[in-house]
Amino acid sequence: MAFVVGEYDYIEAKDSNGVLIRVYTPLGQKHFGQFALDVALKTWPFYTGYFKIGYPLPKPDLIAIADFAAGAMENWGLVTKRETALLVDPDNSSLQSKQRVAIVVGHELAHQWFGNIVTMEWWTHLWFVFLDKFVWF
């Protein structure tokens, strides 16, 4: 479980299955979250269709947090990320920055299935949580 308290802007859209996805950004930076939202809108229906398991919460949220030490964390329903792992300047970000954001968004959303809906039986099975790497191949 996670929650964030602060002043944020957000952008939102529904994916092809009608699931509302929100990306929270620092105030005045909504346009920097659009790329991550676009990636999430394509990734979310893929996972839902591939695993044939719907998401039991009303919506997933992604939030950019300044100086977030972990880089990113797949909390149940609230994916928290360092700003550099979620925000993209549409006019100035490099292709490498966009690729990094796309990989991190896909990775953390996959954890909503691997690690949240289905989780390991014991710590010796920690590898299971990182099965999302299959999407890279």
Regions found by a protein language model. Give the residues of each.
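Hydrophobic helix-coil surface modules that form long, contiguous segments used
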Residues: 1-106, 131, 135
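Catalytic Zn2+-binding segment of zinc metalloproteases
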Residues: 109-125
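Short, intrinsically disordered, charge-balanced linker/junction segments flanking boundaries
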Residues: 125-129, 137
